[in-house]
């Protein structure tokens, strides 16, 4: 029996999320069905992070145990030849039986993309949130992020329906960067609450539009004012960038940002 780890990408707009669900197509079910076809074994996969419906992944990490005699480094090619074009396997490696895609991760990295141009862009529509009620003040939005790094209770940013026992988690790094009309919000944390990133982005947009101040933003999460956090960003602008592990077992992940860099030029 071998434990195999994969780095995968998927277009979340075609799936109900990572996790298996009744009467819906998930990434997990699609991959497990493919593994069954090539091995005739019922395989259970485990992911570093469970993305919601519509959320993309550029460097998701999963693992599974399998008793099937093909070279480990061939799993990517074998699976890609059978999977739909909306899922790609970038790399396959053998790992120790004690290694776990979720529990061995030091932190996860999510990125949210906002297109703040007056004119929507067809080629960015699937991968970003086109939001233009007014020009977003990225300076105020960045100021609002002050104090979020570290271990905190982010209950205000947790959507209903979570099965986590605690809303406390540790943000390793959080930053906001604007390039022309694209705003990228990067969050690295040991774990993420249900709907956490999209809730944070929804509130940051209110700051950028001068509907609330950076102090009000901070007050809402510090004082756990969940009832005031009503706005949430749509799923399509969110991407699971990668997971980082103490031992660098992959050639591509950890060293490279697998998320494409979008640039808008030519109109304003």
From Swiss-Prot:
GO biological process, one term: tRNA pseudouridine synthesis
Keyword set, alphabetical order: Isomerase, tRNA processing
Pfam families associated with the record: PseudoU_synth_1 (PF01416)
Reaction it catalyzes: uridine(38/39/40) in tRNA = pseudouridine(38/39/40) in tRNA
The keyword Isomerase appears for this protein: yes
Active site: 52 (nucleophile)
GO MF annotations, alphabetized: RNA binding; tRNA pseudouridine(38-40) synthase activity
Residues that bind substrate: 110
EC number: 5.4.99.12
Alphabetical list of InterPro entries matching this protein: PsdUridine_synth_cat_dom_sf, PsdUridine_synth_TruA, PsdUridine_synth_TruA_a/b_dom, PsdUridine_synth_TruA_C, TruA/RsuA/RluB/E/F_N
Alphabetized NCBIfam families for the sequence: hisT_truA (TIGR00071)
PANTHER family linked to this entry: PSEUDOURIDYLATE SYNTHASE, TRNA PSEUDOURIDINE SYNTHASE-LIKE 1
Function: Formation of pseudouridine at positions 38, 39 and 40 in the anticodon stem and loop of transfer RNAs.
Oligomer and partners: Homodimer.
Family stated for the protein in its record: Belongs to the tRNA pseudouridine synthase TruA family.
Name of this protein: tRNA pseudouridine synthase A
Protein encoded by which gene: truA
